[in-house]
């Protein structure tokens, strides 16, 4: 049975917590993705990102896409945590951990989850620029 863990939070994310949530004896692989805030967006200096979300809907949609990934890639467990609010340079904005019997399934499912979050889930980000301006994505 899959242990779906989804959280949208204003708190710092502890990647090890997500890894431990998907660790199990029948897993031969755990893949973890950390999306971090970088200092550049299309050649413009960024000092932070600001995230907003329709929290309840976002958590429900992420849980649904984890279920899709389970069926499509035969994963064992998955855990996703996404930040909202102000996220500074080098901080994690999203962490995804996936366990499966074999590494290829874990890698493919992890990529599917992050790509689908960016496409479908109601989470929006605003670049906080060095010049004081910003833009929503």
Swiss-Prot record:
<dbReference type="InterPro" id="IPR036563">
    <property type="entry name" value="MoaE_sf"/>
</dbReference>
<keyword id="KW-0808">Transferase</keyword>
<feature type="binding site">
    <location>
        <position position="118"/>
    </location>
    <ligand>
        <name>substrate</name>
    </ligand>
</feature>
<comment type="pathway">
    <text>Cofactor biosynthesis; molybdopterin biosynthesis.</text>
</comment>
<feature type="binding site">
    <location>
        <begin position="102"/>
        <end position="103"/>
    </location>
    <ligand>
        <name>substrate</name>
    </ligand>
</feature>
<dbReference type="GO" id="GO:0030366">
    <property type="term" value="F:molybdopterin synthase activity"/>
</dbReference>
<dbReference type="InterPro" id="IPR003448">
    <property type="entry name" value="Mopterin_biosynth_MoaE"/>
</dbReference>
<keyword id="KW-0501">Molybdenum cofactor biosynthesis</keyword>
<feature type="binding site">
    <location>
        <begin position="125"/>
        <end position="127"/>
    </location>
    <ligand>
        <name>substrate</name>
    </ligand>
</feature>
<comment type="subunit">
    <text>Heterotetramer of 2 MoaD subunits and 2 MoaE subunits. Also stable as homodimer. The enzyme changes between these two forms during catalysis.</text>
</comment>
<protein>
    <recommendedName>
        <fullName>Molybdopterin synthase catalytic subunit</fullName>
        <ecNumber>2.8.1.12</ecNumber>
    </recommendedName>
</protein>
<comment type="similarity">
    <text>Belongs to the MoaE family.</text>
</comment>
<feature type="binding site">
    <location>
        <begin position="36"/>
        <end position="38"/>
    </location>
    <ligand>
        <name>substrate</name>
    </ligand>
</feature>
<dbReference type="GO" id="GO:0006777">
    <property type="term" value="P:Mo-molybdopterin cofactor biosynthetic process"/>
</dbReference>
<dbReference type="Pfam" id="PF02391">
    <property type="entry name" value="MoaE"/>
</dbReference>
<comment type="function">
    <text>Converts molybdopterin precursor Z into molybdopterin. This requires the incorporation of two sulfur atoms into precursor Z to generate a dithiolene group. The sulfur is provided by MoaD.</text>
</comment>
């Amino acid at each position: 049975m899959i242990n779906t863990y989804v959280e949208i939070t204003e708190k710092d994310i502890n990647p090890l917590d997500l890894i431990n949530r998907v660790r199990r004896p029948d897993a031969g692989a755990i893949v973890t993705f950390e999306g971090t805030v970088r200092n550049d967006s299309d050649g413009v200096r960024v000092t932070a990102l600001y995230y907003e979300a329709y929290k309840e809907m976002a958590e429900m949609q992420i849980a649904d896409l984890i279920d899709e990934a389970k069926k499509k890639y035969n994963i064992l467990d998955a855990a996703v945590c996404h930040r909202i609010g102000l996220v500074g340079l080098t901080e994690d904005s999203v962490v995804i951990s996936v366990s499966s019997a074999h590494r290829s399934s874990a890698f493919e499912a992890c990529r599917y989850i992050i790509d689908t979050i960016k496409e479908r889930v109601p989470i929006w980000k605003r670049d906080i620029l060095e010049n004081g301006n910003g833009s929503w994505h």
